[in-house]
């Protein structure tokens, strides 16, 4: 059972591990799909929205050369749209960091 409350989590996604042995022309689209799958599993929502800054970061080196890791913030928010199928959605945002060394998954205040 998924808790019905807003929350926010900062985590690091290892894209190199997720997209290993994927053909060159499918790496960036697969990276986006893997981030969506991780967000669905972690936050327990079916509606996942990728921020444009994260999309630009993934595609910054082209379709073949994706970054090895990316630090993201997963924000579970209440869906205010009328006629929405799900009560909550997850927004995935990019966090800029200098080094990934020693970073852990952290709960943060929901914005």
Swiss-Prot record:
Keyword Ribonucleoprotein among UniProt keywords: yes
Pfam family, one: Ribosomal_L31e
SMART domains: Ribosomal_L31e
GO cellular component terms, A-Z: cytosolic large ribosomal subunit
GO terms of molecular function: structural constituent of ribosome
CDD domains tied to this protein: Ribosomal_L31e
The keyword ATP-binding is assigned to this record: no
GO terms under biological process: cytoplasmic translation
Matches recorded under InterPro entries: Ribosomal_eL31, Ribosomal_eL31_dom_sf
Keywords: Ribonucleoprotein, Ribosomal protein
Family stated for the protein in its record: Belongs to the eukaryotic ribosomal protein eL31 family.
Protein name, UniProt field: Large ribosomal subunit protein eL31
Gene transcribed to yield this protein: RPL31
